[in-house]
Amino acid sequence: DGKSIKNKFRTKDLRNTHPFVTKMDEEDFSKGLAGRNIALWQSHGRYFEEKTDRWEWQRAPMFQTVEDMYTQSYVLPFLIPMLENAGAYVMTPRERDPQTNEVISDNDPAFEDGRGEGVRIEGRYSETGTWSDAGIGFADARATYSLLENPFQMGTARQAECRKNHREKAAEARWTPEIPERGEYSVYISYKSLPHSTPCAHYTVRHLGGESEFIVNQKMGGGTWIYIGTFEFDKGSEGCVILDNSVPKGYNVTRDAVITADAVRFGGGMGKIARGLKDQPVNEYTTSGMPSFTEGALYWMQWAGADSTILSKYDNDYTSDYGNRGAWVGWMSGGSRTNPKAEGLNIPIDLSFAFHTDAGTTPNDSIIGTLSIYTLLCDGSDKFANGEDRLQQRMYADFVQTEIVNDIRKEFNPEWSRRGLWDRSYSESRTATVPAMLLELLSHQNFADMKFGLDPSFRFTVSRAVYKGMLKYLSARYGCEYAVQPLPVNSFATSFTGSKSVRLRWKATVDSLEATAVPTGYILQTRIDDGAFDNGRVLDGCKVSGNEISTKVSIVPGHIYSYRVTAFNKGGKSFPSETLSVGVPESGNGKNVLVVNNFTRVSAPAWFDTNEYAGFDASLDAGVPYVKEINFIGPQYQFRRSLPWLDDDNPGFGAAWTNEAGKVFAGNTFDYCGIHGKALMAAGYAFHSSSGGVLRRQDLG
């Protein structure tokens, strides 16, 4: 019912005291995760192995994927967006952006030698008003970084006084990238946290869909990359990020408050950390040659300015990659209310989550299932640094595991196995300094598990279950009510109400697994012609008829208008609907055509199962990803069930090629009506569109 569960671990909720990154004009998700800061990561990643003198995967390539990449297909397209849609700020020690291009705009000059394909592009930085030096900061001084080199110790940062009223001088910093090709690019800002830093730095991102504004609390997070969103940019230099020294309405600053500015980067890029043998000259070290998002956390942490004491805790990259992640959480949260005794970046992290899959097979091909792990004691203590009881991690791990198993049993397999709820001394659940857990969702080595595991619908359901578990745990911890964000709307359709107006209608989707996931409002996003979707606007005065919701919008002849609808409530917003388009030619033949989008399939690849041979056959049917696929590394080549695992290079049954790793494969974008409409308009026809589900129910109206 959305009520908080009573428990002995309840503590005071301070989430609105010092918000970190706030998107302006966002709905108030007071029953969601607004004001919460969550640290999470997905499994392992490509790393340098000294024993073999090569970059390699930390796990065996099996069933068309590898754990290093497989859990990405939950965390990046589903889990992180769900948490962000609920209002959370999510940080991760692995690169989240599969975009292989990367542009760095900075106040310091960048390296000159080593430019070329696959290497970062230098953008432009400019200032207006009065600025001064703010001390040590970022500089992209090397084409590659090795050993413990820290780019956040190689340059400088800038500062300007906050403008408390219109009579004081305005100051502005602007970062302008030279985008090499149109696409989606994550935007990371950086700055310096000083004693008098403002809690309300005002950033504006100009992108193909318009402008997005953010308020960033610069009292925390200084000296690393701070993600603020992913946006579509056109090729060239039309986009930019702007920081100004105004004080946003509703905020107050001290008399000596300052804003600070350092580098901004666009896109994830390619690996830029070089490794080699200890007795090898550093100039002979090599990078992974792969996109940054495929690499382990160790390398992103170095690129993000993590302290050398974190990076050098272990003497090999394999152990350092997973062993340093808890220390990274401690560094990010150090000095905050959740980790008050440590030095760090002062971000009050509410929880930490490690998303893994397990190894192991069953002789009868039954489900291995889901294991949840927490750690009661760290260095002999059952208390966190802020005095809270570490036993609450058991409640957290239980909530998440329960949501996952219950939802899988109801939606996919009633016999899905619930494994243990372990108290074990795993680094990722022991050292994080905040409530933490490690999830082993399923066995990536077990064919029965992976029949479900390669299905995008399964990954959506599991990710939603993890998000619900986190939400309900934090509700219990802080004693606040919760609501789960709605599911995407269905039965979307458009129809003309005149030559310059269109009726949009849809239905809310009932969530049979969650009573609180009921929409209370809707957001409409619009794209005109070949532009990008805008930020959207909340629809006021929608007409409700039975279970159908509708609204009217205006159009201008000669343009194609594309729409998608998002449902929201006090807990957050849904994923967007499919995209429908309409258009009226300026001088047409007066006839209308209905375009029906009936391509709604998402699926796992084809599989077969016999006593001796089994596996996935992508040549027969590669399946259909949701929007895009990032976990496919190559087709399965070993189908003999009898072959055992020998080592990760010879994993036996299920073994897969790896020649496609790091590539992004097209999936179902649910955005096709405009393509057909463009051709129809060229032929003189007006067009509108509908989802296939409406047509199947003969409900076009």
Model-derived regions, located:
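A short beta-strand element within beta-rich, extracytoplasmic domains
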Residues: A160-E161, A171-P195
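Beta-strand-rich modules
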Residues: K552-G572
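Extracellular carbohydrate recognition and processing domains
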Residues: L208-S237
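Active-site-adjacent mobile loop/cap segments within catalytic or ligand-binding domains
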Residues: L148, R163, K249-N252, A263-G271, ...
